[in-house]
Structures are given as C-alpha cells and as structure tokens.
C-alpha cells in the first residue's frame, strides 16, 4: 500500500522540485513563470518523455515505466505495435499532441512524473505497489480511483499550479470574486479571465477550476446561468 501523504505533504514535495526547476532555468519567484512539465520531467527528473500511440479508443492517456518491459498496442485497423520501454520512460498517447489537448497532455506528463517522484522518494512503499501492478503505471481516462492515483493527481496539480503561481496569475488577470461566485458564462468577465489563466499556465478549465476551489477563490460549483443571460435570452 502506498505511503500516507497529505495534500500538505505533497505540496512540500512539489515545492522542492519547483525550486530545482526555477534554479535550473534562472526563474525567480518574484516573477514566477508557468512550469513546463516536459522540461521538468527531462531536465530535473531525468525522465525520457515520448509520444506514441497507446490505444485505439483514447482510454489510456499515458504511462510511466519502472522496469524494462514490452508493450503492445492494437490500433483501430488491427495493426499491432510492439515497443520496448526502459526505466524512467514516460510515454504519452500521441492523440494528446493536438493543440486543443494541451491541458490534458501537460497534466498527464505531470501525473506520470509524479509517479516517478514518489517511487524515488519512497522506494519501499512504492516498490510493493510496482510489484502488484507490473512494471508500468497507467493514467486512464476513466480509471478506477485509488489512493496512489489520488497522490499522483494531487502532486501533479501542485507541480503545475503551485499556490504562489496561481496567486500571481490571479493578480495579473485582475480576478475579483469577492463572494466566491463564478458564472460559467461569457457574461461573467471572471470566467474569461480564468480561461486565460488556464491557457497561460497550460492546464485545462477543469484543472484550474478545481485548484481555485481548493484555494477557496471559488465557492462551490460554477453557476451556468448568469443574470444577464436571463435578460438577454428570456430564460
């Protein structure tokens, strides 16, 4: 079973690697910049990031490799591809190379990097998990929730959206939600600002929304119908 790690524990772990990333690329927290997960994975963690077709139905977003192994994927036309993966390989499904998949691609890279970070930091705990599941950890689009996957997702979010960076982006975007209410509507200027924040950081709308909720910038779920929409469309 994976070691118990709280959100605060995972935030501290992420902070150490972000510090290394900023030092490596000469970035100051006084003028924070978004974290490129591929650069973090390769330059800081020593991982090999690749893009290959992993499935024909979009169910497997990415995987990371702990021991040398073979991997076979059957494409939609029946073609079988066989790849040999090595330790520290991070493989992202090539369908995520599209421009409109930037958020999902970045989060998947960060998620797989998180698995490697946890395995490096806690080899005894995660070594047992590795033996149970084989040599590969997968990120599935609709995978079953587990403690280890929660940890990888939480660490990935902390790597991509550390509090200091999100706060800087809130200030840059002049985001103002005094009552914590957000309307998921073009009638709410805050919605457009949050979309711009997500694009700058390189994450999806869902990822930034969840992060802002965790930081209590947004209270509850966004409301889909803005009062101005009612006036315009007579709803």
Give the role of each language-model region.
Residues 1-235:
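Active-site hotspot residues in diverse enzymes, especially metal/ion-binding acidic/histidine motifs
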């Amino acid at each position: 079973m994976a070691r118990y790690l709280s959100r605060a524990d995972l935030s501290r772990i992420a902070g150490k690697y972000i510090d290394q990333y900023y030092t490596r690329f000469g970035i100051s927290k006084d003028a924070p910049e978004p974290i490129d997960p591929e650069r973090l994975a390769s330059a800081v963690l020593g991982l090999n990031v690749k893009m290959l077709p992993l499935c024909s139905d979009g169910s497997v977003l990415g995987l990371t490799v702990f021991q040398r192994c073979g991997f076979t994927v059957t494409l939609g036309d029946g073609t079988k591809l066989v790849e040999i993966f090595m330790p520290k390989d991070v493989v992202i499904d090539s369908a995520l190379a599209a421009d409109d998949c930037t958020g999902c691609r970045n989060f998947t890279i960060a998620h797989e990097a998180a698995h490697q970070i946890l395995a490096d930091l806690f080899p005894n705990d995660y070594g047992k998990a590795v033996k149970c599941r084989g040599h590969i950890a997968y990120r599935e689009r609709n995978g079953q929730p587990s403690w280890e996957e929660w940890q990888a997702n939480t660490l990935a979010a902390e790597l991509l959206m550390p509090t200091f960076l999100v706060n800087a982006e809130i200030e840059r975007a002049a985001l103002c939600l005094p009552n914590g209410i957000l309307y998921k509507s073009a009638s709410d200027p805050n919605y457009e600002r949050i979309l711009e924040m997500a694009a700058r950081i390189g994450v999806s709308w869902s990822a930034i929304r969840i992060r802002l909720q965790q930081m209590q910038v947004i209270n509850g779920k966004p409301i889909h119908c803005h009062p101005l929409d009612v006036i315009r469309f007579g709803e």
